From Swiss-Prot:
The gene is tmk. It comes from the Bacteria. This is Thymidylate kinase. The keyword Transferase applies. GO terms for molecular function: ATP binding; dTMP kinase activity.
Amino acid sequence: MADAALKRGPGRGRFVTFEGGEGAGKSTQIKMLADRLEKDGVRVVLTREPGGSPGAEIMRHLVLSGMGKLLGAEAETLLFAAARDDHVRNVILPALNQGSWVLCDRFFDSTRAYQGSQGKVAPDVLNAMQRVTIGDLKPDLTLILDVPVEVGLQRASARRGSGAPDRFESEDIKFHKGLRDAFHKIAATEPRRCVLIDATASAEAVSNIVWDAVRERLFTAVAAAS
């Protein structure tokens, strides 16, 4: 994260991350939350990982095309770390310091689940990469969208149509079930930061649950700080 620094205090924006397996509906829910926040006068920056900045988008292409997998699990994780470092320095921190709310489709919890739990990269390696790339930056709220693996993969297939599955969509069912378990464990381990949301309902119903969680967890905190 180099010399970038995160401001503290009431002028800082809020950082909300969306996590979950393939086809959980993260992209849809981020857009719906952004619309609601903007109607309330909140400045919002939408972003994603891997990607979100010009340099990180290059890394995204390398990873999702499958080229990173050819290098091995730890090397692939280094690509994610390089993308995150660029993304945090050039997009996330500047937006938060300017008072905007940052809504991010995936963050370090996905690295824990995908590369840690399923890629078998050692926890000490992941922790070292996390310290270097994000320092003490943590999401104010993480919304983990949960759907059964079969449902998520069906949604992902319908979304891409005739296109080929990406690097992670093409993994076997055991991999995806392991991912779901990993996200459940993250939610259970950090209940103050994470909210596990049943995302099998309609987009509108899930959006209402997301909105309730944001109001309860973050609007109260904003009011208390002001």
